[in-house]
């Protein structure tokens, strides 16, 4: 890779401004990245991080400001042009051709040739060479569809490296990874740093920022707040700069009071194993029940079985003393169940459709009038209720949901389900990919729903979240219930011990 003085900047974005009709998304924002460094880019959802990067890649045309890369003023017109110049991005949503091989994906559009034919031997050798440099152990000949999420991310990094990328931007790269996979990813990122790359690292996970980053740039409401070395900064200082105020507590004060049991789950077993096996628990009115467990504990399988997504082979689901079948999601919804799924982008939202559609899609039937026509008045009224009740920040109900921040998207999904009038609200990783300020708002919302006597089940991989918001925690281990603990009386060590019981 090209040698560059460590004191020089690889990338300088200076005074970048971007306006949309009625909104100034960026106001004179700066981002300067050095070689041999990992640079955190932080800010709440909606702070302008994505808009800034879209200006870099030419997806948006900036209104003012300068972009200098390797000492030259540039204005990329596309991601492809940026990649070929040496600026690459590893997205949250991985963009790969699943039915093609690993090496096909790396060299797509620039295959080495031998005469009129693709030189498969050279392509294999070049792929192995890149993998060896980055300590990646993947067979270049396997189809991408067979890879894990972490391997797909490593493939994206290898592709960037094969383009001799000087700047690699990583957007929430660990959101779907296990701890072991995260550690391996960090090793690869550090190798890129050693080779002279400048890495822009976007994450809401503070512990990762402190572990791996050298410098940090903080944005708030489209404005550049500060850029400084990470050394000497505290988590509270960063949060304060991100939210513009001191966040005195990470979780709202618990005000809900669990009452009588409304849901009893007895010996729940899913049809297709390995999955949930002989799981029993109760949920009380106004209670927030957490579900904890290590990766592979089958936490998600519980709520999917209750919601009719997974077929049940045995066991009972009893709501208010009545035995339910919940053979499919439609029946579960009619019985008062709602499920906010784990993968917001792939199974939660229709990103290219507006807020109205995304708010009402779970219960379209109730908006039908005579001749099967939809009531625009009621649809508009209910959409506005979702926006107001969930405190969604949006210019209009006609705004495409994909353009909103993750926190606002999640609020709309929760609002969508509240329109169905559920008694049991199940939330799978409800704050994944959401910034610290928006997390607090989601927690407040969950607490308000518990105070309105909803029974709430929360699955989370974040131990502080479970300990901060729940009343009791069901600990899963390898598809089985290892125990249920009172949140106020338990510890992280006890939960981890239970989570290992059936391994």
Curated annotation (Swiss-Prot):
Main enzyme class: translocase
Topological relation to the membrane, as annotated: Peripheral membrane protein
Domain ABC transporter stretches: 11-246, 257-503
Domain of life: Bacteria
Record's subcellular location: Cell inner membrane
InterPro entries, alphabetized: AAA+_ATPase (IPR003593), ABC_carbohydrate_import_ATPase (IPR050107), ABC_transporter-like_ATP-bd (IPR003439), ABC_transporter-like_CS (IPR017871), P-loop_NTPase (IPR027417)
Family label: Belongs to the ABC transporter superfamily. Galactose/methyl galactoside importer (TC 3.A.1.2.3) family.
Protein's UniProt name: Galactose/methyl galactoside import ATP-binding protein MglA 2
Source species: Photobacterium profundum (strain SS9)
Gene expressing this chain: mglA2
């Amino acid at each position: 890779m090209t040698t560059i003085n460590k004191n020089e900047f690889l990338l300088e974005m200076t005074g970048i401004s971007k306006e949309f009709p009625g909104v100034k998304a960026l106001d004179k924002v700066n981002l300067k990245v050095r070689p041999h460094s990992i640079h955190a880019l932080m800010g709440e959802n909606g702070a302008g991080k994505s808009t800034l990067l879209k200006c870099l890649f030419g997806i948006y045309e900036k209104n003012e400001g300068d972009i200098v890369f390797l000492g030259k003023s540039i204005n990329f017109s596309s991601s492809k042009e940026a990649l070929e110049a040496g600026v690459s991005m590893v997205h949250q949503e991985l963009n790969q051709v699943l039915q093609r091989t690993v090496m096909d994906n790396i060299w797509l559009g620039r295959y080495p040739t031998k005469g009129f034919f693709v030189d498969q031997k050279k392509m294999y050798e070049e792929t192995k060479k890149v993998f060896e440099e980055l300590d990646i152990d993947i067979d270049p000949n396997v189809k991408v569809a067979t890879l894990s999420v972490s391997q797909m991310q490593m493939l994206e990094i290898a592709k960037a490296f094969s383009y001799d990328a000087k700047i690699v931007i990583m957007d929430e790269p660990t959101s779907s990874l296990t701890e072991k996979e995260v550690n391996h990813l960090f090793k690869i990122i550090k190798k890129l740093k050693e080779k002279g790359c400048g890495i822009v690292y976007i994450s809401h996970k503070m512990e990762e920022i402190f572990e791996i980053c050298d410098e940090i740039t903080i944005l708030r409401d489209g404005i550049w707040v500060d850029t400084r070395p990470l050394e000497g900064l505290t988590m509270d200082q960063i949060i304060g700069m991100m939210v513009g105020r001191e966040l005195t507590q990470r979780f709202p004060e618990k005000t809900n009071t669990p009452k009588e049991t409304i849901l009893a789950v007895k010996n729940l077993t899913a049809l297709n194993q390995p999955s949930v096996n002989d799981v029993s628990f109760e949920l009380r009115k106004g209670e927030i029940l957490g579900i904890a467990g290590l990766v592979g504990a089958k936490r998600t399988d519980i709520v999917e079985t209750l919601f009719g997504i997974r077929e049940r082979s045995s066991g009972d689901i009893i709501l208010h003393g009545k035995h339910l079948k919940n053979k499919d999601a439609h029946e579960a919804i009619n019985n008062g169940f709602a499920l906010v799924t784990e993968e917001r982008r792939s199974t939660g939202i229709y990103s290219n459709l507006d807020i109205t559609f995304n708010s009402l899609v779970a219960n379209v039937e109730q908006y039908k009038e005579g001749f099967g026509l939809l009531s625009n008045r009621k649809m508009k009224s209910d959409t506005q209720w979702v926006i107001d009740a969930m405190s969604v920040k949006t210019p209009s109900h006609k705004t495409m949901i994909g353009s909103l921040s993750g926190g606002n998207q999640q609020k709309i999904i929760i609002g969508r389900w509240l329109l169905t009038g559920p008694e049991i609200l199940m939330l799978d990783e409800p704050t994944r990919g959401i910034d610290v300020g928006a997390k607090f708002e989601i927690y407040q919302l969950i607490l308000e729903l518990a105070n309105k006597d909803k029974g709430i089940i929360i699955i989370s991989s974040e131990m502080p979240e479970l300990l901060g918001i729940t009343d009791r925690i069901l600990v899963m281990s390898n598809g089985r219930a290892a125990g249920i603990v009172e949140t106020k009386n338990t510890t992280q060590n006890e939960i981890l011990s239970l989570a290992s019981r059936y391994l």
